[in-house]
Amino acid sequence: MELTTEKLTTWMTLFAQKINDNKAYLSELDTPIGDGDHGNNMARGMNAVIESLNDKNPTDLTTGLKLVAMALISKVGRAAGPLYGTAFLEMAKASKDSADLAQLLTVALAGIKKRGGAKLGDKTMVDIWEVLTPEVADNSLTPEKIEQAVLNTKDLEANELLI
């Protein structure tokens, strides 16, 4: 699937809505190992993403992806901002050569792994991205596969060096 500026805006709008709808739950999940503010941080970041996309109305994908990255880096605290920001910066760089979503997600995942040092099995976002990115490439991603990927992380033990 080709990612366009319009699809990026729709994706970010839907993602922002999900984050805002679930920010209390995300903060609750963060409480045992963090400071319980992940939902609020992500909501603040995604609201900034939407504001930036609406204000600047990018006409090309690279610019749109950079706007997303910069909003996340500047507004989301702790590790999530730099990790998501890196993902979107890597996508922005790669989008100069390709708008293929699977390719963009692959470089985003590589950026996340390099930035955070996580690997499969560390109970991080890498455990989801690593499993589901190939599903995007195969055009076989389903809600059931997403749910299964999430469930598969439930009993993983978090790598304490990454907390």
Give the location of each predicted region.
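N-terminal loops that bind phosphate or other acidic moieties
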Residues: 1-163
